[in-house]
């Protein structure tokens, strides 16, 4: 784990280091901590209503690599979700050791957020994901989410699990809409609904989870 700048974020560092993780998961924890970077300098706050440009900047910050080759999408999406919650660029991820092996989302959640995030019931299409997110925004004003997809189709690799993010954008005098963010990618970081649909067959398995303010 790399810490840059002053000691102004010692509370974050100590919280991450003090997580009570099962000893059986110690190797996974080491992989996560080795890849995780924490910015200790005071950062400029992003606005409450995030724009597409804000999200693109935040996603690029999170992917802290020169040459990205790692299966660290779970960590990237958790870092971005954490940063969006705090409206600051705080956490980022380098490539993970054993780059072809993904990370356990439950362990990542415990390290980043202090507990495993509650997961939605299974959604069968990206359209259902969009509907679920907008519904949760209407009811609770939740606006930032992590999406776990079980049937993501990646070039060369084929079908695999993949985590990415979604945020509800509220532009002035316009209807709120869902913007997907894939910080694992180095191009087209903000795919449209139609573009992201191309990575899935007609049916799939999707789960939505989000950080609960009361656990902060």
From Swiss-Prot:
Classification via Pfam families: SpvD
Cytoplasm in keyword set: no
Domain of life, per lineage: Bacteria
InterPro entries, alphabetized: Sal_SpvD
Swiss-Prot/TrEMBL keywords: Plasmid, Virulence
Family under the similarity heading: Belongs to the SpvD family.
Biological role stated in the UniProt entry: Not known. This protein is involved in the virulence of salmonellas.
Descriptive protein name: Virulence protein vsdE
Organism: Salmonella typhimurium (strain LT2 / SGSC1412 / ATCC 700720)
Taxonomic classification: Bacteria, Pseudomonadati, Pseudomonadota, Gammaproteobacteria, Enterobacterales
Gene: vsdE
